Amino acid sequence: MPVQGSQRRLLGSLNSTPTAPPHLGLAANQTGARCLEVSIPDGLFLSLGLVSLVENVLVVTAIAKNRNLHSPMYCFICCLALSDLLVSGSNMLETAVILLLEAGALAARAAVVQQLDNVIDVITCSSMLSSLCFLGAIAVDRYISIFYALRYHSIVTLPRARRAVAAIWVASVLFSMLFIAYYDHAAVLLCLVVFFLAMLVLMAVLYIHMLVRACQHAQGIARLHKRQRPAHQGFGLKGAATLTILLGIFFLCWGPFFLHLTLIVLCPQHPTCSCIFKNFNLFLALIICNAIIDPLIYAFRSQELRRTLKEVLLCSW
């Protein structure tokens, strides 16, 4: 969702300082600092959004079609796909509207454009917040399934999962509305950053604990079968690599955006921070890339879901 046109404001306030946005570029020029600015064309935004949209629509359709996938785990995966779908869809809508406005193909009053922009703001922000929440919910669900396997079905029931999903969506919408209304308050931005760090720590702690338990389990099996130590080490390295990829992708895709928010609070007028602000569009593109990667990590690895997806595609043809 690039912030280039005069009518574009969706999260555009984050692409400048809250106090004096026009001076960002001037500060960089005065100091002679060289800024590395990565330009993200509108066509690339539309392409990334379309890929993410198709992927996540397929995930939601497959889970809705197969009753065997109507479990708490797939409920969270479906909601994650829906959140990513909304992130991509709202981004594509905003980009398309701005392109039409700039080309003169769409005529609209400023008040109408402002209202549309506000709606897209809320959809985008709430879907981003809910996406982070559902990533955390999936981690908690997997943790309970491993460490409380015998009690899992009594702890994580479908009604409880549905209540959790409803609470996440309601909270995401409410907080996104507060964020849009009070985006120029440092406390609001810091709350978003703290929320991201909390999700990162939660996922890291849970997945690392799960990896340690899996390695201990593999070591016990190796002792029973009197296998050599390298086999256990190989399993540990594979698990560590998988964990690194999972958390690394999460941090690389979401981290720059929340670093941007942090710098707005800490150094809004500093030339170096001003250079980082210029790459706001890149940070948003990384979030859309995360929406593309999420189905590959959490959904398409399921054999049952892939089988249902094949049936859906064959029936559509």
Swiss-Prot record:
Membrane topology note: Multi-pass membrane protein
Subcellular location: Cell membrane
Keyword Membrane: yes
Residues carrying a glycan: 29
Keyword Membrane: yes
Record GO biological process: adenylate cyclase-activating G protein-coupled receptor signaling pathway
GO molecular function: melanocyte-stimulating hormone receptor activity
One Gene Ontology cellular component annotation held by this UniProt entry: plasma membrane
One Pfam family this sequence matches: 7tm_1
Cytoplasmic side: 64-72, 141-163, 212-240, 301-317
Keywords, in A-Z order: Cell membrane, G-protein coupled receptor, Glycoprotein, Lipoprotein, Membrane, Palmitate, Receptor, Transducer, Transmembrane, Transmembrane helix
Summary of subunit composition and partner proteins: Interacts with MGRN1, but does not undergo MGRN1-mediated ubiquitination; this interaction competes with GNAS-binding and thus inhibits agonist-induced cAMP production. Interacts with OPN3; the interaction results in a decrease in MC1R-mediated cAMP signaling and ultimately a decrease in melanin production in melanocytes.
Function: Receptor for MSH (alpha, beta and gamma) and ACTH. The activity of this receptor is mediated by G proteins which activate adenylate cyclase. Mediates melanogenesis, the production of eumelanin (black/brown) and phaeomelanin (red/yellow), via regulation of cAMP signaling in melanocytes.
Family recorded in the similarity comment: Belongs to the G-protein coupled receptor 1 family.
Protein name as catalogued: Melanocyte-stimulating hormone receptor
Taxonomic classification: Eukaryota, Metazoa, Chordata, Craniata, Vertebrata
Gene that produces this protein: MC1R
